[in-house]
């Protein structure tokens, strides 16, 4: 029978000092036999996805204590990728994931907490907390802040839906008037919550459902809707049950590594491919799998991408649907239901509610459930009122979207595409693979060949795109922006958005060892591995080299002879200490980022730290 971890600090005469300090936090004699549960919050006023979380930790804590636990809250950092985008701040985004994971480990282990409720939401916060949860392997439930309502405005006598990416594209489009750009900017992000499309934050929050670590509705129920409060109330009660199951009944099925098994990771990736999720999810799932000591690799993702169709299409791949529409169509469970009927899921998995996948689908899939309360929850809709307050409205759609032929979520027979929304490509400068979000690629450019325009920083590429130096047919190559080379693996949302602004969204390709925002669409290929800074062949590409992209056949090829590439590699190595570094880039890199770069692996490993350098 496992012993409560917290007993280390609450029992025995030699822990009198620790108990004295616990008493100063409000604990009493009656509390010293109860489980201590960490409420891991991420409130900040910097990030719209987290601005409403201040009081939600208290809400969870009250439920924990009512159920017989002791709740202790702390906060992690949270970087807003959208605000950090397009300048030096983006260097810090991905590294913040490791800091978040480490900070959770530090706090939980330093104070011997028994379990956790993780209140996350945005791009690196959910992955960081997920990595920590699987590293620590103590009972955990995730409950995120929820998606933002889609923006809406009237253009050309038509009401259209908007999000952050629209503001970026219109702001850079010289054909758009100042007044229209301002109108879109003011309408794009109307409420608190994670940006309203299937961007990285919402993708990851959806995947926690498929991993079994959050409750049904977590990925899609709007931040502003009153129904979301119930997820927080349930999490506080349920975590105490899970904690007691493990520590008092020796039931290891309550532990996250036994819930988020390899089968669950395969289900999560299957969901990701089917819903056209952000390419960043590949990085984060690979990283989380390593923390769980699960053998889940790019090869597994490649195999899944070849058999899973696209059953859901959401912004940025279309402007017709946003997360509020996914929820109306049944949310994550709705997509999982269609995947299950297609025979594409592992059914022998459970979630934090203790339900198997078939049981979860029977209760929560709107196509089969008989539960009116569940159907009512999935009718939760937007209010269209600007607010930073959680649970501030209770509007509902008149009807559910259960049309699996033409609705937001489709059945296998009516799939948007027989190929899924993500693909792994391999070739002579991506020997370990690269990732493309096929959901956002126009059919006309699934095969594409063009001359390379090579840039060794995102800034130089942006200047060239906006300066008219990139023309139709070009393949823009941005290198030395990987985890080690950036350092920090910047997102390339501005270059891809500016290609659209210049009318080149369907006429050019962009390839990088960096990564993309979940808001990216177009022929945008990232995570090229090995990265240039690690001696990857992307560092050998020269201006004018022809690059052939073949998404249907999962290929990407630099059309240069092996002999020529060998000669270029020899010349690169001859640069000595300067080998595999950018030639003409001035960038101030802090000590903190240099420390990150010294241990960073390429994207095919999840951009995690190289344990071999630490003796691990």
Curated annotation (Swiss-Prot):
Cofactors, names only: [2Fe-2S] cluster; Mg(2+)
Function in brief: Functions in the biosynthesis of branched-chain amino acids. Catalyzes the dehydration of (2R,3R)-2,3-dihydroxy-3-methylpentanoate (2,3-dihydroxy-3-methylvalerate) into 2-oxo-3-methylpentanoate (2-oxo-3-methylvalerate) and of (2R)-2,3-dihydroxy-3-methylbutanoate (2,3-dihydroxyisovalerate) into 2-oxo-3-methylbutanoate (2-oxoisovalerate), the penultimate precursor to L-isoleucine and L-valine, respectively.
UniProt xrefs under Gene3D superfamilies: IlvD/EDD C-terminal domain-like (3.50.30.80)
Protein name listed in UniProt: Dihydroxy-acid dehydratase
Keyword field contains Isomerase: no
Family: Belongs to the IlvD/Edd family.
Annotated PANTHER family: D-XYLONATE DEHYDRATASE (PTHR43661), D-XYLONATE DEHYDRATASE YAGF-RELATED (PTHR43661:SF3)
Entry EC no(s): 4.2.1.9
Alphabetical list of NCBIfam families matching this protein: ilvD (TIGR00110), PRK12448.1 (NF009103)
Biological pathway: Amino-acid biosynthesis; L-isoleucine biosynthesis; L-isoleucine from 2-oxobutanoate: step 3/4; Amino-acid biosynthesis; L-valine biosynthesis; L-valine from pyruvate: step 3/4
Gene: ilvD
A Pfam family annotated for this UniProt entry: ILVD_EDD_N
GO biological process: isoleucine biosynthetic process; L-valine biosynthetic process
Catalysed transformations (reactions): (2R)-2,3-dihydroxy-3-methylbutanoate = 3-methyl-2-oxobutanoate + H2O; (2R,3R)-2,3-dihydroxy-3-methylpentanoate = (S)-3-methyl-2-oxopentanoate + H2O
The keyword Magnesium is annotated on this UniProt entry: yes
N6-carboxylysine carried by residues: 124
Organism of origin: Escherichia coli O1:K1 / APEC
Listed InterPro entries: Dihydro-acid_dehy_C (IPR042096), DihydroxyA_deHydtase (IPR004404), DiOHA_6PGluconate_deHydtase_CS (IPR020558), ILV_EDD_C (IPR056740), ILV_EDD_N (IPR000581), IlvD/EDD_N (IPR037237)
């Amino acid at each position: 029978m496992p012993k409560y971890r917290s007993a280390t600090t609450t029992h025995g005469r030699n822990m009198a000092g620790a108990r004295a300090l616990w008493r100063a936090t409000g604990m009493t004699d009656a509390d010293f036999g109860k489980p201590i549960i960490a409420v891991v919050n991420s409130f900040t006023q910097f990030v719209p996805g987290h601005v409403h979380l201040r009081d939600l930790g208290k809400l969870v804590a009250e439920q924990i204590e009512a159920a017989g636990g002791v709740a202790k809250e702390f906060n992690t950092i949270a970087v807003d990728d959208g605000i950090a985008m397009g300048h030096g701040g983006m260097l810090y985004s991905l590294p913040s994931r490791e800091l978040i994971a480490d900070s959770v480990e530090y706090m939980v282990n330093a104070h011997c907490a028994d379990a956790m409720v993780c209140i996350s939401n945005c791009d690196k916060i959910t992955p960081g907390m997920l990595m920590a949860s699987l590293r620590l392997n103590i009972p955990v439930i995730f409950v995120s802040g929820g998606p933002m309502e889609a923006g809406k405005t009237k253009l050309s006598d038509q009401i259209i839906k908007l999000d952050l990416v629209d503001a970026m594209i219109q702001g850079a489009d010289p054909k758009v008037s100042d007044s229209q750009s301002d109108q879109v900017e003011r309408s794009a992000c109307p409420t608190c919550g994670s940006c309203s499309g299937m961007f990285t934050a919402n993708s990851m929050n959806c995947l926690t459902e498929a991993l079994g670590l959050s409750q049904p509705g977590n990925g899609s129920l709007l931040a502003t809707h009153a129904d979301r409060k119930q997820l927080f109330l349930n999490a506080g009660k349920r975590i105490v049950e899970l904690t007691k199951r493990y520590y008092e009944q020796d039931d290891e099925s309550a532990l996250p590594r036994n819930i988020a098994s390899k089968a669950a990771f395969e289900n999560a990736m299957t969901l990701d491919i089917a819903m056209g999720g952000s390419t960043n999810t590949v990085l984060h799932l690979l990283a989380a799998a390593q923390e769980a000591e699960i053998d889940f690799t790019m090869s597994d993702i490649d195999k899944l991408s070849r058999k899973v169709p696209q059953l859901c299409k959401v912004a940025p791949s279309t402007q017709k649907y946003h997360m509020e529409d996914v929820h109306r169509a049944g949310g994550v469970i709705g997509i999982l239901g269609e995947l299950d009927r297609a025979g594409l899921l592992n059914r022998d998995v459970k979630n934090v509610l203790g339900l198997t996948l078939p049981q979860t689908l029977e209760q929560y899939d709107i196509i089969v459930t008989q539960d009116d309360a569940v159907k009512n929850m999935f009718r939760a809709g937007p209010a269209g009122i600007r607010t930073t307050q959680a649970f501030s409205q209770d509007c509902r759609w008149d009807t559910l979207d259960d049309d699996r032929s033409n609705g937001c979520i489709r059945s296998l027979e009516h799939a948007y595409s027989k190929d899924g929304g993500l693909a792994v490509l391999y070739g002579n400068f991506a020997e370990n693979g690269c990732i493309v979000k096929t959901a956002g690629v126009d059919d006309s450019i699934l095969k594409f060949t063009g001359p390379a325009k090579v840039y060794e920083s995102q800034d130089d590429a942006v200047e060239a795109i906006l300066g008219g130096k990139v023309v139709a047919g070009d393949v823009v190559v941005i290198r030395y922006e990987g985890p080690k080379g950036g350092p920090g693996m910047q997102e390339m949302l501005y270059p891809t958005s500016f290609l659209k602004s210049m009318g080149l969204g369907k006429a050019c390709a962009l390839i990088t060892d960096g990564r993309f925002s979940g808001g990216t669409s177009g022929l945008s290929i990232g995570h090229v591995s090995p990265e240039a800074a690690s001696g990857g062949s992307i560092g050998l590409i020269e201006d004018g080299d022809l690059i052939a992209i073949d998404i249907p056949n999962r290929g990407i090829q630099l059309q240069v002879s092996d002999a020529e590439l060998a000669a270029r590699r020899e010349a690169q190595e001859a640069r000595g200490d300067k080998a595999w570094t950018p030639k003409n880039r001035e960038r101030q890199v802090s000590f903190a980022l240099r420390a990150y770069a010294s241990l960073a692996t390429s994207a095919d490993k999840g951009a995690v730290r190289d344990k071999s350098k630490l003796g691990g």
